[in-house]
């Protein structure tokens, strides 16, 4: 809403294998005349939707969790949203593979600039949950992968991190609350790194539920929503190689040179505040120019839809344009 023009595009992006592959996404151009140098562009990385093609955000209406985007569009930013590799396009989505997601967030900016000469080189980025993970990877990759772009800052809401730590704890969880996400994490790792042999790690119940990760979106993984997390893996499964893979894709050790704002709700039970605190601590140790804001009483959904964090993110981005 509020755009002079909205486009659904197919563009070439670098896949998890390193080959070029078609990907999809959207471009929104502000109303009015672009400033000298072109519209600054904001690349938004979406949160978890699923792995099936039907879960691609470009196929749906703008969700409540993307309330920041119309605000930035009205303020004079071109807004782009990548669906990520394998969502809404050929191939499968390597969920939470950092390099794949990060490149998608940058590749759509390149594609947008080729098709819309009014878009300039000034880049800002943001994301929520999986998208926070993706945007942080994009911030790390930008100087070497897309040096023609001028990245000014990245704002992330409840960014996914410490997935390896959480995978190690699956056997201790006797409820199904996290099981749908666990299913997607397993499938994403399997797609990105088949040599891990993920399916061989599953229990009979896990194997029975596993195909659903390729067909259903996050809100409809019914087999997983009734499967206790500690029943997903086989009793004798050795998950160390899987944990090593997940740790290699964690954003915690990324070297990011441009400013980062991390916004976290204190009552989030999906991306736990303790993990975001650890992420911030490691960033500061590594001299990442990061600011962390905690929002009392906000959870995983409300942190990206409530007035205060939205205003703080918009202010952070505007100051760096």
Model regions: which residues?
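C-terminal catalytic histidine-bearing segment of alpha/beta-hydrolase fold enzymes
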Residues: 235-244, 270, 277-321
């Amino acid at each position: 809403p509020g755009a002079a023009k909205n486009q659904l595009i197919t563009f070439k992006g670098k896949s998890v294998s390193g080959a070029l592959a078609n990907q999809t996404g959207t471009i929104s151009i502000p109303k009015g005349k672009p400033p000298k140098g072109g519209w600054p562009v904001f690349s938004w990385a979406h949160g978890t939707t699923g792995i099936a093609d039907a879960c691609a955000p470009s196929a749906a209406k703008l969700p409540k969790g993307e309330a920041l985007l119309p605000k930035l569009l009205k303020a004079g930013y071109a807004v782009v949203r990548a669906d990520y590799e394998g969502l809404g396009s050929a191939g499968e989505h390597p969920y939470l593979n950092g390099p794949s997601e990060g490149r998608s967030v940058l590749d759509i900016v390149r594609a947008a600039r080729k098709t819309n000469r009014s878009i300039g080189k000034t880049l800002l980025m943001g994301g929520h949950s999986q998208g926070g993970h993706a945007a942080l990877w994009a911030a790390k990759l930008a100087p070497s992968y897309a040096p023609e772009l001028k990245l000014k800052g990245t704002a992330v809401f409840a960014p996914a991190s410490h997935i390896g730590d959480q995978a190690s704890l699956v056997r201790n969880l006797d409820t199904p609350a996290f099981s749908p996400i666990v299913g997607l994490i397993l499938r994403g790792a399997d797609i990105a790194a088949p040599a891990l042999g993920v399916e061989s790690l599953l229990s009979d119940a896990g194997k029975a539920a596993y195909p659903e990760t390729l067909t259903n979106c996050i809100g409809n993984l019914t087999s997983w929503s009734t499967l206790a997390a500690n029943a997903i893996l086989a009793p004798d499964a050795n998950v160390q190689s899987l944990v090593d893979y997940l740790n290699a894709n964690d954003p915690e050790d990324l070297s990011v040179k441009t400013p980062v704002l991390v916004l976290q709700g204190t009552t989030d039970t999906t991306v736990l505040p303790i993990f975001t605190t650890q992420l911030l601590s490691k960033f500061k140790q590594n001299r990442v120019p990061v600011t962390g804001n905690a929002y009392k009483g906000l959870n995983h959904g409300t942190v990206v839809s409530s007035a205060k964090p939205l205003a703080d993110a918009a202010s952070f981005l505007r100051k760096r344009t």
